[in-house]
Amino acid sequence: MSSKRAPQQVASLVERLNRLGLLLRDESRGLDRSDLVLGAPCTHDSRQVLPGGAFVAIAGARADGATFAQEALRRGAVLLISEPAGVRLISTLGPEAVEVPLIAVSNARRALAEASAWWEGDPAEELAVIGVTGTDGKTTTATYLATALSAAGFSAGLISTALQRVGGGEEPVAAHQTTPEAPALQAQLRKIAAAGDRAAVLETTSHGLALDRVAAINYAAGIVTNFTSDHLDLHGTVEEYRKAKLLLVDRVRGSAASRAAHLEPLMVIRRADPSLAPFVAAAEAAGIRVVDFDVAEDGALLLDGQRHEVPLRMPGRINALNAAAALALVAAWKLPLDAAIAAVSAEPGPPGRSEAVDAGQPFKVIVDFAHTGPSLTAAIGVARSLLVAGGRLLLVTGAAGERDPGRRTAVGRAASAAEQIWIADEDPRDEDQDVIAASIRDAAGELLGASASERITVLHDRRAAIAAAISAAAPGDVVLLAGKGHERTIERGGVDEPWDEVAAAREALTSLGYPQGT
């Protein structure tokens, strides 16, 4: 929900959009009224319009938002914002739609971002906003960074897929949330600023960048964790996906708050990763300092070349890299590093990331959000580091429907590294679950050869698959439940079914006589 604000003069919004080159004045109407004010936020969802608010019509994949203008007006919208095609559509909806003041813009998504920031009073300018992007590791890195900054005396809010923090407290997140849409994002930044936090760590996805959700934010710094092919359902090609991620570099400009705190604009990028070379080049071309991070062979963290021994509660090299990225930023900003290291060492990590489920059983159960090929490979590496001699890795995995089909092949190939594999539903949405499972099975089977039929089981019922894997575990084994992590729903046929991966694991352990779940 947006914070309560005094009514705002629409003229100042018009001036802002004009200054940014978004306003199409000749196609706008009704903007000469001196009494035109907004008393409620802007939104692109007609169902969320409040009396006195504005409705931004965005052309979507299935419908043009302008078709919902009448509903927005019925709910009390006093201003419409639309691109020219939407303006023409609105003009056919009757006298009420024609008479309401309308701002025509060249880019409705960008206008939504700017209007949302304008309504909330540009909270990002009151904060040092750090964006964390990359294919995998964003949530853990963002969590480590918020923890590190706060411990170093620079209190930080957090907006991430699995966790939100405001003023030192934690808040629940929306189901399947990525980077929130601009109205919700700006409202959350206002909450963080109002709570007295000085920074906001924002998990910044390619969707958030490509769809202009973060277009009104001047970042103080950015972190790129890694880059591999993903989200081709949105971007089409790896090149377009990379271009979307590179937009973060363009947005690292510093805010009023970060400049006042003398925080140098930075990009934290691992130079040893060849896939990140374009990000290094873009940052250097923009005159932004690049801060390096890495992990030594013996596990020490390398913060821009400086070696630090940092014991972590989260196991595995991937989590060490995430911690190194976060601490490299703290060190580069010359904040108290010892305090930050101590806090990161104690950080258990976000829910659903290398999360252990312990009920006293003689084998380990790990819940992890890993849902791409590279992240599953990393999670399997972490799980294998926990095996005792002779132990087996038992894996439950899957892939989402209506998403990049290439992800399924990558997940299947990664899954082949497990001794036993159960392929279960993740979020089939409106896609045939058998088709999804077959893609994963076939990819794994190509690598497993003749043993595939013995090692792979397709069991769509995720609860049953988890129970089967845990029932099959012997002392010294590790059961890895991959793909859902922290998420609290399974999307199937337009319905969000309640789900809790950790609870499902505990239920299976209890049925085997291990009741003391933690």
Regions found by a protein language model. Name each.
Residues 74, 78-84, 267-271, 394-397, ...:
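Short internal beta-strands
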Residues 82-85, 204, 226, 271, ...:
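Short secondary-structure boundary segments
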Residues 81-89, 160-163, 271-275, 486:
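Short, polar loop motifs at secondary-structure junctions
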Residues 53, 72, 115, 132, ...:
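Residue-level signal for inorganic ion chemistry
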Residues 109-267, 278, 282-285:
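Phosphate-binding loop of NTP-binding sites
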